[in-house]
């Protein structure tokens, strides 16, 4: 195919107007097996594409690659009725006669490279996937639910939604907490304003580069205190960007790591334990149990599980200690008394040993975390941990870009605080319920 194959007489003006993609023209065709055959508008123009390697205009068509795509056409202004269209796009690949070795595809804007959906269909799929499963949304639109395409579909829409957000208003207190999702750790960056906890973002990994890329967008002069999980790369990043801030490890972090260790023991040694909701009831203070009738069942279950009994007793000691005015010496004593059989707690002992200076710094802080801080962090961690299986981009999109951010206006400029922790937890659980219950997506 080249300029000899089609002329302007081959253009179907009515179908081109009906399709409504500015850069494409529809060709007259008698083929019923391919939907609409389309080429780029520049196919009929004298424009010479520049070589991306040497910027020369001495380029010519080298070959044609046919791309099959699905497109979405809305049939009403309310975007409730639609039609899915098959497109066969004849995409030209150009060769540069100047540098001789460069072969490149003609650039397009209506669809991403490698994606089998046009951007307007891709955007509709992404908007639905923020709230429902990708498979359910694809079923609604009648297109294949390829897992290979979900990342490309979501990343484009995430970039768009992110571009609409106002800049972050830098809080005086920042917290960086690693949340666990499908066995991987992702730093959640939290801000504290007027006693409320807000989520600013969830980062792809805990590396210094990733964490630093976000932190440098904040105003270092405004940050006074940073609560950081005991992870070396996170500490290196915050020390680099906020050298004047007080950087500490909180009692909440110690309790969270101890709780995670306790959960590992419950899952390995507590199979068929005679208590409903054992993960929650075996990780809270004995005196705070919401149902006292489970106390005899806990005692009964522990009789045949000596390692779980040891872990439970030692974890209870830590929880009781944290309710008092504890000291570093108290924590070290608890760590020294970790039973040899319960090596899951050794990681908590390492935190107390290695990050003792940062824990001591927390004790001397004039301003402690708000009363709801531990509850807010645990709620976020639990909600994300229980989200249905998906890739990171989908998880982050559902958490950060499908929930309303709190904003404020100052000197005529709009700023955002982030997402209030209670709203974040509620919406994540709602989205997870949508997916688990396989609720219908659409307008039925």
Regions found by a protein language model. Name each.
Residues 244-263:
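Inter-helix linker motif
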Residues 98, 178, 230, 252-254:
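Residues immediately flanking
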Residues 1-101, 105-107:
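Short, conserved DNA-binding cores of transcription-related domains
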Residues 258, 262-279:
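Conserved phosphate-handling catalytic cores of large alpha/beta enzymes
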Residues 176, 252, 372-374:
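Single, functionally critical "micro-switch" positions that shape active/binding sites
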Residues 149-237, 244, 437, 441-444:
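RNase H-like nuclease fold core
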Residues 72-185, 221-223:
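Short, positively charged, Gly/Tyr-enriched micro-motifs
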Residues 48, 53, 59-60, 183-185, ...:
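Acidic/histidine-rich catalytic cores and adjacent linkers
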């Amino acid at each position: 195919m080249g300029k000899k194959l089609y002329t302007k007489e081959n253009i179907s003006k009515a179908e081109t107007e009906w399709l409504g993609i500015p850069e494409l023209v529809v060709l007259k065709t008698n083929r019923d097996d391919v939907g609409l055959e389309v080429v780029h508008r520049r196919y009929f123009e004298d424009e010479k594409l520049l070589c991306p390697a040497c910027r020369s205009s001495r380029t010519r068509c080298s070959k044609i690659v046919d791309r099959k795509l699905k497109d979405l056409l809305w049939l009403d202004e309310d975007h409730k009725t639609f039609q899915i269209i098959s497109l066969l796009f004849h995409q030209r690949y150009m060769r540069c006669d100047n540098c001789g070795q460069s072969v490149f595809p003609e650039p397009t804007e209506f669809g991403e490279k490698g994606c089998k959906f046009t951007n307007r269909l891709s955007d509709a799929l992404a908007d639905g996937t923020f709230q429902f499963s990708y498979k359910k949304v694809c079923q609604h639109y009648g297109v294949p639910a390829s897992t290979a395409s979900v990342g490309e579909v979501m990343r484009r829409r995430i970039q768009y939604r992110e571009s609409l957000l106002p800049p972050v208003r830098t809080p005086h207190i920042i917290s960086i907490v690693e949340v666990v999702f499908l066995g991987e750790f992702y730093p959640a960056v939290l801000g504290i304003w007027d006693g409320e906890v807000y989520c600013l973002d969830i980062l792809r990994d805990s590396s210094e580069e990733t964490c630093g890329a976000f932190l440098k967008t904040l105003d270092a002069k405004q940050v006074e205190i940073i609560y950081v999980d005991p992870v070396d790369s996170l500490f290196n990043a915050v020390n680099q960007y906020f050298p004047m801030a007080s950087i500490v490890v909180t009692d909440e972090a110690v309790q969270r790591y101890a709780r995670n260790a306790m959960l590992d023991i419950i899952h390995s040694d507590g199979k068929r334990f005679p208590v409903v909701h054992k993960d929650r009831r075996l990780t809270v203070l004995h005196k705070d149990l919401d149902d006292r009738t489970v106390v005899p069942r806990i005692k009964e279950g522990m009789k045949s599980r000596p390692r779980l009994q040891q872990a439970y007793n030692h974890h209870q000691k830590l929880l009781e200690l944290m309710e008092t005015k504890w000291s570093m010496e108290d924590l070290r004593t608890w760590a020294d008394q970790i039973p040899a059989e319960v090596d899951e707690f050794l990681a908590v002992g390492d935190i107390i040993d290695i990050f003792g200076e940062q824990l001591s710094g927390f004790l001397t802080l004039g301003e402690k975390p708000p009363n709801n801080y531990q509850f807010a962090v645990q709620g976020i961690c639990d909600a994300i941990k229980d989200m249905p299986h998906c890739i990171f981009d989908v998880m982050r999109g559902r958490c950060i870009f499908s929930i309303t951010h709190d904003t404020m206006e100052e000197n005529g400029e709009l700023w955002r605080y982030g997402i209030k922790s209670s709203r974040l937890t509620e919406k994540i659980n709602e989205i997870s319920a949508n997916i688990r219950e396989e609720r219908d997506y659409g307008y039925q």
